[in-house]
């Protein structure tokens, strides 16, 4: 079915709500007569109908060739990475078990494409029930910035793993499962989604990445808003060559 919305009386918020309901449904082809380019930056193109420019919503942002190339890069890259790093995985698992009681793998509930939740795997870097170690001031800082400079919850082994981003290596399994990409925007949780505001529609059109533009920027002290802008820049400017560059920069940063 085709849904054409050409009312000048609708506000941007009302049109955005229409987009949320019908824009990504496979059984509806949505066209809007107003500019949402300042809000939705991916998956849109303009086509005239009776001299009226209508914004149409494309269900597929990448071309078939680009999507195939990215899928191949993700699958074979993750498979090779898991095989090559298997001895390191064993060593890290032993170190975690000796350092503190608790599981080796931590599951973090995050949002994937279309807002579908899944469990992202990480090596455990914190003490079990570590939140009880936080002071009220630290808890407030964590709520605001989603990170702490001197986090008392992190174990000794965890600090080493985080320093070299080794704690995220189990997410290669998520890549093999098709839930993540090697390169993409940073993953977010449901509570974080609200902080993206109008940008959340863009963020959830692609898979979250094991690494990305922000992770290799060399700046760990940037604000949340700038991290969001980096994610949006990647989504707007994706090419397979950009992915290859970021993979190389990620490897060099870790090594």
Region annotations inferred by a language model:
Residues 34-38, 43-47, 105-153, 211-230:
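Short, glycine-rich, amphipathic interfacial segments at transmembrane boundaries or analogous
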